[in-house]
């Protein structure tokens, strides 16, 4: 967990576990230690006394001490407190103030966590419990020891610690598990329950480590990151076994929202069902995400909105499409420069318009309901919405779909190309070449 000479910040609450950890690391030697403490201010004078106790302990040991005072927002106090502590620890690591943050979680904490998550219906990811080492640099050296062993260590050395009165109350679910359910199950079913649950976490972590590599590979093949969203082909999901499809959906959710906070089995299952539905459309919700089905695509992301735009494009030049990283490039070309290829190639591949047929009042805007025109190759005018449906273009791609007009006439649209009445032909002298580019 530690390299010799590593800078290790120890998160110390003042309780038995963290006090034991600090003393043990001092005894171990060879590390550059510092002490971190978070005061949530929830217990008034007692919270301040905890902070003073930890500060004095650090001073006696000659260690740097960093105190963070936080005010918790509304909601689950236990959960918000944990998030505040982890945020502080991650900030210390990100700022380069330490190489590792050591926390005092024990095997007893592990057992409580696994049992709690099992009761809530967690899969193997949740049953993996508390990780001994995280990628961010948080380590838990006491994770193989039970709480009773920790307290015995402190009593033998006559080392004092602080007792948090809220740990004895019944208002928090974890306390009810710690003081009620877990001892009862151990007494009536399995005396070695703490060890059994810890082994369950170890087994689940190994499973998750294997699947992480497999899902990394599948994600690269099946998931596409877009602007504020992740896209999945429904056929890709349907080709997988249900177990793998669920894991891939979890990864897509994590990519789209940054974490899996608040996401449960039911959310994942609804996304899988949406992908498998016979209809090519539908919608469901995941905490923090809107999930839409359109034809053979799923989109997981923030809700997309249509943002109307109307621009005078640069000729020549590139005009960026608002809300996207795409742009429309326009270039005037003399006929002599384009005569080496048949005209139909230029019209279909490049989107060339006859400059003389244009009145010069060009406007670049997004598609609107009711828009219609006659693309080259069609015998009559068609609504662009119908073209979208024929080409199976997802609804979210249509919102900023570019249309080039000249006066009241649509002369070009993405994918469907030049209008028949404005397309360049053999008689054209100067042509307007259109193209789409990605703007970095």
Swiss-Prot record:
<comment type="function">
    <text>Ligates lysine onto the cytidine present at position 34 of the AUA codon-specific tRNA(Ile) that contains the anticodon CAU, in an ATP-dependent manner. Cytidine is converted to lysidine, thus changing the amino acid specificity of the tRNA from methionine to isoleucine.</text>
</comment>
<protein>
    <recommendedName>
        <fullName>tRNA(Ile)-lysidine synthase</fullName>
        <ecNumber>6.3.4.19</ecNumber>
    </recommendedName>
</protein>
<dbReference type="GO" id="GO:0032267">
    <property type="term" value="F:tRNA(Ile)-lysidine synthase activity"/>
</dbReference>
<dbReference type="InterPro" id="IPR015262">
    <property type="entry name" value="tRNA_Ile_lys_synt_subst-bd"/>
</dbReference>
<dbReference type="InterPro" id="IPR011063">
    <property type="entry name" value="TilS/TtcA_N"/>
</dbReference>
<dbReference type="Pfam" id="PF01171">
    <property type="entry name" value="ATP_bind_3"/>
</dbReference>
<dbReference type="GO" id="GO:0005524">
    <property type="term" value="F:ATP binding"/>
</dbReference>
<dbReference type="GO" id="GO:0006400">
    <property type="term" value="P:tRNA modification"/>
</dbReference>
<dbReference type="Pfam" id="PF09179">
    <property type="entry name" value="TilS"/>
</dbReference>
<dbReference type="InterPro" id="IPR012795">
    <property type="entry name" value="tRNA_Ile_lys_synt_N"/>
</dbReference>
<dbReference type="InterPro" id="IPR012094">
    <property type="entry name" value="tRNA_Ile_lys_synt"/>
</dbReference>
<comment type="similarity">
    <text>Belongs to the tRNA(Ile)-lysidine synthase family.</text>
</comment>
<keyword id="KW-0547">Nucleotide-binding</keyword>
<feature type="binding site">
    <location>
        <begin position="13"/>
        <end position="18"/>
    </location>
    <ligand>
        <name>ATP</name>
    </ligand>
</feature>
<dbReference type="Pfam" id="PF11734">
    <property type="entry name" value="TilS_C"/>
</dbReference>
<keyword id="KW-0963">Cytoplasm</keyword>
<keyword id="KW-0819">tRNA processing</keyword>
<keyword id="KW-0436">Ligase</keyword>
<dbReference type="InterPro" id="IPR012796">
    <property type="entry name" value="Lysidine-tRNA-synth_C"/>
</dbReference>
<keyword id="KW-0067">ATP-binding</keyword>
<dbReference type="InterPro" id="IPR014729">
    <property type="entry name" value="Rossmann-like_a/b/a_fold"/>
</dbReference>
<dbReference type="GO" id="GO:0005737">
    <property type="term" value="C:cytoplasm"/>
</dbReference>
